[in-house]
Amino acid sequence: MMSFVSLLLVGILFHATQAEQLTKCEVFQELKDLKDYGGVSLPEWVCTAFHTSGYDTQAIVQNNDSTEYGLFQINNKIWCKDDQNPHSRNICNISCDKFLDDDLTDDIMCVKKILDKVGINYWLAHKALCSEKLDQWLCEKL
């Protein structure tokens, strides 16, 4: 019985630390701290996150000379540091792998720095796909 409880506990803790693909309503709830920050509405953020990563907190995109991480696809040349790019400017002062978990606190802090420095156009999906007709990005459950 004790080994079953231990195994169950390990399974629960393992699951709790894993990154995940979030739902629209989970993203909507998690991003409340970004509401209207930099003049960007919450539905705009939900749309941008969807078109940037598909709500996947583990999303990694390798480019020719850089890599983008997490829900917001934060780049390792400027915003975070990893082994691939040890000379990053690391403006957010964080390891890129911190953007690959389901705790979005550090992601949101870095997103605010990106907004302050370069604005919402850092995310190409925003202008093309998320600047109008935003009703579909609301969460009806809340």
Curated annotation (Swiss-Prot):
Query: Listed disulfide bonds for this chain?
Result: 25-139, 47-130, 80-96, 92-110
Q: Name one Pfam family in it.
A: Lys
Chain residues that bind Ca(2+):
98, 101, 103, 106-107
Which InterPro entries does the record associate with it? Glyco_hydro_22 (IPR001916), Glyco_hydro_22_CS (IPR019799), Lactalbumin (IPR000545), Lysozyme-like_dom_sf (IPR023346)
Q: What is its main location?
A: secreted
The residues that carry sugar chains are 64, 93
Q: In which tissues is it expressed?
A: Mammary gland specific. Secreted in milk.
Q: Where is the C-type lysozyme domain?
A: 20-142
GO MF terms on file?
Answer: calcium ion binding; lactose synthase activity; lysozyme activity
Q: Which domain of life is it from?
A: Eukaryota
Q: Do you know which SUPFAM superfamilies this protein is assigned to?
A: Lysozyme-like
Sorted alphabetically, the keyword list is:
Calcium, Disulfide bond, Glycoprotein, Lactose biosynthesis, Metal-binding, Milk protein, Secreted, Signal
Write the signal peptide boundaries.
1-19
Q: What does this protein do?
A: Regulatory subunit of lactose synthase, changes the substrate specificity of galactosyltransferase in the mammary gland making glucose a good acceptor substrate for this enzyme. This enables LS to synthesize lactose, the major carbohydrate component of milk. In other tissues, galactosyltransferase transfers galactose onto the N-acetylglucosamine of the oligosaccharide chains in glycoproteins.
Subunit description:
Lactose synthase (LS) is a heterodimer of a catalytic component, beta1,4-galactosyltransferase (beta4Gal-T1) and a regulatory component, alpha-lactalbumin (LA).
**Family per record:** Belongs to the glycosyl hydrolase 22 family.
Protein's recorded name = Alpha-lactalbumin
Organism encoding this protein: Ovis aries
Q: Which gene encodes it?
A: LALBA
